[in-house]
Swiss-Prot record:
Role, per record: This protein may be a central component in the iron-acquisition system.
Taxonomy, superkingdom: Bacteria
Name of the coding gene: fbpA
InterPro entries assigned to the protein according to its UniProt record, in alphabetical order: Ferric-bd (IPR026045), SBP (IPR006059), SBP_1_CS (IPR006061)
Protein name (database record): Major ferric iron-binding protein
Length: 331
């Protein structure tokens, strides 16, 4: 009896001596389904619970800046790198361990100058087209050529998409500001704007337009749901380093204001790990940046995309692109 009591007291003492793992709050600008899948996998692996507050990345970045040291967020998970760059420039992010930063890599993958965020996955800009109206030979060799009279009322785009804004940045870097503004004005005059990439995709599928500029994963999700043999659309990869072949990146960071930095760093490390990348790419057709992970979707190999080696990684680049959209009458 005394022995049993001693063991019980010892177990209680050990439990009391072991610090409890804190739950963490993630401000999530990534697609909620993908973030939830990774959060659930992380909780199963560590026991740490994750609360997701989901909204647009720019909105969340602005909220974090407003909240400052009072922010309840521990981690910022962003669909676009410029939102992370905004917070890095404001010195609101905590440096990450090299072991986390080094998990994801690849040609053209952006790296934080202050090592305070890490890139996690990539999405390819593509042209989705109606196979009932077009074949590959009918499509343009450059995304710039879709902003012309030939494509009047035939080409769709989503001007409020963060990836669209990053594509504008890519055109500025590769072709110059004048070319970017001309492209935007051409799309404004000849193209058809849609509220979302998914809506533009559906418009092509429904035969309303012939083609649209979107991210690859929208089509992959649609084709997986409907069955690829049952859809009328396919993807065209522009390739040869054209801005139309741009890869955009998601990433994550730990906030300096976090009261749970150890747990937050564990979560970001998990996002970059093999386990985290597998959880993400099982539900979303994004390119894993951990070289040991292969997507469950039938993706075009990233090496064959021939993507330009540019990306939007600074606040000024994003602001410049936004001003060009305003000049073109898109905002």
């Amino acid at each position: 009896m005394k022995t049993s009591i001693r063991y019980a007291l010892l177990a209680a003492a050990l439990t009391a001596a072991t610090p409890a793992l804190a739950d963490i709050t993630v401000y999530n600008g990534q697609h909620k389904e993908a973030a939830q899948a990774v959060a659930d996998a992380f909780t199963r692996a560590t026991g740490i619970k994750v609360k997701l507050n989901s909204a647009k990345g720019d909105q969340l970045a602005g909220q974090i800046k407003e909240e400052g040291s009072r922010s309840p967020a521990d981690v910022f998970y962003s669909e676009q790198i410029p939102a992370l760059a905004t917070l890095s420039a404001a010195n609101l992010l905590e440096p990450l361990p090299a072991s986390t930063i080094n998990e994801t890599r690849g040609k053209g993958v952006p790296v934080a100058a202050k090592k305070d965020w890490v890139a996690l996955s990539g999405r390819s800009r593509v042209v989705v087209y109606d196979t009932r109206k077009l074949s590959e030979k009918d499509l343009e060799k450059s995304v710039l050529n879709y902003a012309t009279p030939k494509w009047k009322n035939r080409i769709g785009y989503a001007p409020t998409s963060g990836a669209f804004l990053e594509q504008v940045v890519a055109i500025v870097k590769l072709k110059g500001e004048a070319a970017a503004l001309k492209w935007l004005k051409g799309l404004k005059e000849y193209g058809k704007p849609y509220a979302k990439n998914s809506v533009a995709l559906q418009a092509v599928e429904n035969g309303e337009i012939d083609a649209a500029l979107i991210n690859n994963y929208y089509w992959h999700a649609f084709a997986r749901e409907k069955g690829v043999q049952n859809v009328h659309t396919r993807l065209n990869f522009v390739r040869h380093r054209d801005p139309g072949a741009l890869i955009t990146y998601s990433g994550a960071a730990v906030l300096k204001s976090s009261q749970n930095k150890d747990e937050a760093k564990k979560f970001v490390a998990f996002l970059a790990s093999k386990e985290g990348q597998r959880a993400l790419t099982a539900v979303r057709a994004e390119y894993p940046l951990n070289p040991h992970v292969v997507s469950t979707f039938n993706l075009e190999p990233i090496a064959k995309l021939e993507a330009p080696q540019v990306s939007a990684t600074t606040v000024s680049e994003k602001e410049h692109a936004t001003r060009l959209l305003e000049q073109a009458g898109m905002k």
